[in-house]
């Protein structure tokens, strides 16, 4: 019994599988148009696969033919056979319709998607093409503008620009030339001429002034300190100690004061600041650093025309408030004035006078004044 049941189940499964295969085949056959088969076999029996008769009132090439009601499929259950055709007719229409709808919907969806996508893609393509056309148009315009023949106004403009540039160039070249000439003239003035022997007097070789790497300006002022006080003045490179013994003879009204020997240094600072002053001046009208007595090595011309060198005394005012007077004339500040024998110096409003003499000077007048002073003192003491 069990074996018979299993065989029946197997046979039923096989039939079901064969029926499913046939139905799938039938679905594929139904996709093909059945119309050409009907045209080929118009006298086919009632059991053929022709479609049902058209309803009255509908027009068509099939509607003209009358079909017998015997050809219609009977709905009675007694006439149904177990053939594969009946099984095919018994298969539900829903899966067939679903299959057809799915197959028909896919291309529709694809078309709709393409229709939705195409406008956006077309817009992007149009935008890209328009941008390319613009760039090409700009490049063509630039090329055409470069290739265009230059008009008269443009030529005039270019010529004016060239002229302006040439004028500026000439102006700058002239300025450079002037500066160069000035520098050359200044250098030639600073050069020293060294005479050659008598045979080669016509050719004189100028010697350039060597650069000085010594301190100057503010750096020199910072380093030029004495006893913790910054000195306003710095000695020049031609400063020398004199061989001649110069002296200063001070007088206060008619009173003769002690002689000052000023030949041991190259410079003497005169002022009210006793800490740094070499020759102190105690009058309140004088400045702390009032003036400087300086010896300098300078050139002079001899009687035979040759050039010699000599150390001479000079006085320079350091910008004092009340000034320095040479022979009762005020001198300019920050400027050297040469001193000669028997010159008289005064500083500020002080009543003291300083007479400049040296060891070989005629001091008879001074000796006479000293003798008179001594006689007056003796007379006063006797009385």
UniProtKB/Swiss-Prot annotation:
Subcellular location: Nucleus
GO CC list: cytosol; nucleoplasm; nucleus; U2-type precatalytic spliceosome
Single GO MF annotation: transcription regulator inhibitor activity
Compositionally biased tracts (Acidic residues): 370-383
Stretches assigned to the FHA domain: 268-331
Region ranges (Disordered): 1-209, 359-383
UniProt xrefs under PROSITE patterns: FHA_DOMAIN
Gene Ontology biological-process annotations: miRNA processing; mRNA splicing, via spliceosome; negative regulation of canonical NF-kappaB signal transduction
Subunit structure of this chain's protein: Component of activated spliceosome complexes. Binds SMAD4 and CREBBP/EP300. Component of the minor spliceosome, which splices U12-type introns. Binds the SMAD1/OAZ1/PSMB4 complex. Interacts with DROSHA and SMARCA4. Component of the SNARP complex which consists at least of SNIP1, SNW1, THRAP3, BCLAF1 and PNN.
Protein name: Smad nuclear-interacting protein 1
Biological source species: Mus musculus (Mouse)
High-level lineage: Eukaryota, Metazoa, Chordata, Craniata, Vertebrata
């Amino acid at each position: 019994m069990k074996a018979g049941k299993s065989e029946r189940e197997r046979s039923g499964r096989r039939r079901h599988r064969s029926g499913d295969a046939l139905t799938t085949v039938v679905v594929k056959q139904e996709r093909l148009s059945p119309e050409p088969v009907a045209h080929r076999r118009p006298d086919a029996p009632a059991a053929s696969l022709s479609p049902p008769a058209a309803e009255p009132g509908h027009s068509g090439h099939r509607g003209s033919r009358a079909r017998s009601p015997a050809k219609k499929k009977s709905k009675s259950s007694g006439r149904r056979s177990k053939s594969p055709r009946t099984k095919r007719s018994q298969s539900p229409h829903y899966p067939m319709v679903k299959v057809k709808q799915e197959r028909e919907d896919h291309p529709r969806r694809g078309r709709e998607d393409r229709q939705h996508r195409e406008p956006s893609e077309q817009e992007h393509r149009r935008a890209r093409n328009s941008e390319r056309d613009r760039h090409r148009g700009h490049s063509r315009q630039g090329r055409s503008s470069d290739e265009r023949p230059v008009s008269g106004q443009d030529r005039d403009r270019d010529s004016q620009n060239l002229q302006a540039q040439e004028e500026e160039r000439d102006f700058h070249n002239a300025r450079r030339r002037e500066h160069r000439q000035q520098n050359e003239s200044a250098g030639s003035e600073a050069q020293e001429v060294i005479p050659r022997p008598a045979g080669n007097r016509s050719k004189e070789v100028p010697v350039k002034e060597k650069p000085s790497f010594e301190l100057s300006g503010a750096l020199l002022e910072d380093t030029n300190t004495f006893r913790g006080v910054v000195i306003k003045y710095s000695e020049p490179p031609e400063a020398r100690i004199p061989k001649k013994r110069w002296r200063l003879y001070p007088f206060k009204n008619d009173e003769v004061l002690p002689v000052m020997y000023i030949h041991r240094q190259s410079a003497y600072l005169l002022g009210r600041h006793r800490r740094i002053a070499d020759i102190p001046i105690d009058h309140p009208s004088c400045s702390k650093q009032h003036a400087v007595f300086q010896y300098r090595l300078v050139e002079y011309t001899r009687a035979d025309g040759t050039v010699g060198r000599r150390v001479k005394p000079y006085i320079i005012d350091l910008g004092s408030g009340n000034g320095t007077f040479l022979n009762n004339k005020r001198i300019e500040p920050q400027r050297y004035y040469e001193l000669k024998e028997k010159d008289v110096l005064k500083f500020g409003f002080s009543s003291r006078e300083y007479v400049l003499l040296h060891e070989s000077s005629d001091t008879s007048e001074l000796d006479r004044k000293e003798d008179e002073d001594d006689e007056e003192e003796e007379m006063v003491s006797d009385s």
